[in-house]
Amino acid sequence: MEIEVGDFVRTKQGKIAKLIEVSKNNYYWFDNWIYKESGIPHQGFRIEDTERIGIVKHSKNIIDLIEVGDYVNGERILDITGDYIHTNETDHNRFYLAKHIKTILTKEQYKANCYTVERKE
């Protein structure tokens, strides 16, 4: 897996980060803490740890990492077509390009942080 500075990555836990530096001793440094679940105690890791980290996708284009069910700018993604992502959360269709993306909440993060209220029927 060839990840370059400026590439975005997505882990199997749903974390998204951008590679900001590859140090002289071949440590990969990201702008977000994506290693916590893998037991790596710092923000940098060697390329041989990529599988342990659980990186499942990488791309220079952030839109390539977004999946149906994720939330972009607070709206649930219903479809992805080429460079467009489609939502329909406010009774009208909305399409986003990569340049319009401000925030991403992956479906994995949503599920991990969601509290379900159980009701007795």
Predicted features along the sequence, with ranges:
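Structural boundary micro-motifs
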Residues: M1-E121
